[in-house]
Amino acid sequence: MKTSTIYVKTLKFVWLRLALGMAVTVTSIILFAIIAGISNLVGAEPVNMAGLTIWFILSAIIYGLVMNYVGYMLKAAHVAVVSKAVTLGYVPDNMVEEGKAMVTKRFGATNAYLILDKLVSGAVRELQKTVGKVGNIFSGVPGMSNVVEFLQTFIGIALGYIDECCLGYTFCKEGEGAFKAGCDGVVIYFQNIKKLLKSALVTTVMVMILTFLAWFITCLLLVAACNALEWGWIGAAFLSVIVSAALKYAFIDSFIMIRTMKAYMEVAPGTVITFDLYDKLCKLSAKFRSLFDKAKGEMVA
């Protein structure tokens, strides 16, 4: 099943992600309007820097709380359905309910999924930092700083979807413990890193272009609206970041997630795991070591 086909067939998840993102956005806009109203009442500028700071902090807190709980479980259900679509070639009609049931069956409790996702994401961030350490070697070479910076950005985006791939792998290995399957999933990704990074090059360029377009178009529209309401362009710039983040979360991230998972699932079944890679990754990442320890705990139990 092609990436575009899976994307279209799982659009219900995309719309749910958009609804979630827009709910946060609308809440943020209401907060902005309240702060602007208070500023006008006290005779200050429409929205001064103090008001913008308060608004930005409150918006960030709301965004983090919603995405860390509701967003995580929605993503998990989406990943579960996509993993079946890639490996088995079908998408259930009641995909949302089926996805939730798969997550509940696989992880039992929400907490188990959150722990696994945090460990995988943390391991990815730590492994990404090794690129920065290598890049410091070339810091004195003229022009190399830009190359290293792009390389770090590229690696960051390319590895940013590993957690979805590893979570998807856990749904394909139902006979194994969730942490064991997740740990194996990370190892499989890095064992095939050269092949997968080649595919990720196109993905990275797509993410950069689409994210910029989402922000730029949103920014133009909101600047025009805020100027008409005399709210100033600074507020429009902040709002455009939130709105474009919601659009990216729903449309861009969903497509890239499916594309990355498909590339991963094509190589995962035929990969014979190199066991010394566990030890190497444990030395590079404390988070991966914690994940590996939990996997060993499952095997003992």
Where are these regions (language model features)?
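Helix-coil boundary and N-terminal low-complexity module in membrane systems
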Residues: 1-211, 225-229, 234-235, 241-301
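Hydrophobic membrane-spanning alpha-helices of multi-pass integral membrane proteins
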Residues: 208-220
